[in-house]
């Protein structure tokens, strides 16, 4: 996001996300950028360069700390809001889990090291595993 939006000024907004479900063994890592049509190719190049940089250099401790903080704060919020707590409890019943599973998960997340995260990212997210989709008004290209 920082590279495409602030540094290169190519995108109105860019994000990446990881979705890991509990009901199946699949996960999704995705990224997107909103940009002017004339910037599409440069945004793709920037995305690939940034992904290759992470694969080569790895995530930093600060990036891991920020991501971990966000996940753990969201988990606390899930327990503080009635609707979210009900969803968590209901899912735990379906998954035959207790809230102790959630605590153990959060403890495991707390103990992750940058080296572990980088090893897993390199194993599962090489550039050749990505599908790149471009959408928009092609008449403006």
Model-derived features: where do they sit?
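Short proline/glycine-enriched turn/loop segments at secondary-structure junctions
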Residues: 19, 121-124
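Mature hydrolase/peptidase catalytic cores and their serpin-fold inhibitory cores, especially
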Residues: 107, 116-122
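Short, intrinsically disordered, charge-balanced linker/junction segments flanking boundaries
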Residues: 139-141
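M16 family metallopeptidases and their MPP-like homologs
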Residues: 2-111, 128-136
